[in-house]
């Protein structure tokens, strides 16, 4: 049975509806405290020594008490704050990309169930400039092409409640 999505039929109040002048500079900013950082670095060592497929990782399989508390704060910002959160920050300088991605997967999974990022079912999608030219069959997120403001995964019959991004490398230019 296909469920029809309902269109918004009411105003959204602050803090979810805002303009840049409404927000303090630190809006949505959540600092990764030392306890959570320690849990993540300890888990990074475990995952490096015992490689597992990222998609098989579940937060409840690990002792991540401090990280679960941190992610509850993130969820609070998403649901009752400005609607976004920026975690400052994973210690990427100490992590291999695969391990950082695994930690990101686990943290995001504490908020909600991950969903496919593309029509072909990719659960993790790498946004990077591949040098391809935009056009038919080439997603703009693998090119240098600028994009309009958009909502990721809006094509999904059951779109996600949250979208999460892990920035491994800051772009030389562009972005926010």
Protein language model regions, located:
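Non-heme Fe(II) oxygenase catalytic core, chiefly the N-lobe of the double-stranded beta-helix
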Residues: 2-176
């Amino acid at each position: 049975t296909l469920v029809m999505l309902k269109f918004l039929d009411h105003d959204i109040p602050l803090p979810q509806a805002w303009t840049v002048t409404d927000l303090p500079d630190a809006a949505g900013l959540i600092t990764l405290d030392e306890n959570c950082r320690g849990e993540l670095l300890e888990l990074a060592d475990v995952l490096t020594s015992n490689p597992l497929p990222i998609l098989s990782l579940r937060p409840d399989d690990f002792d991540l008490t401090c990280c679960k508390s941190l992610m509850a704060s993130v969820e609070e910002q998403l649901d009752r704050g400005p609607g976004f959160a920026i975690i400052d920050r994973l210690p990427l300088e100490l992590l291999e990309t695969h391990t950082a991605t695994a930690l990101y997967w686990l943290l995001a999974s504490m908020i909600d169930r991950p969903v496919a990022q593309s029509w072909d079912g990719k659960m993790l999608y790498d946004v990077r400039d591949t040098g391809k030219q935009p056009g038919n069959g080439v997603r703009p997120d693998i090119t240098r092409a600028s994009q309009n403001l958009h909502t990721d995964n809006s094509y999904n019959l059951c779109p996600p409640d949250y979208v999460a991004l892990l920035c491994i490398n800051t772009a030389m230019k562009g972005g926010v």
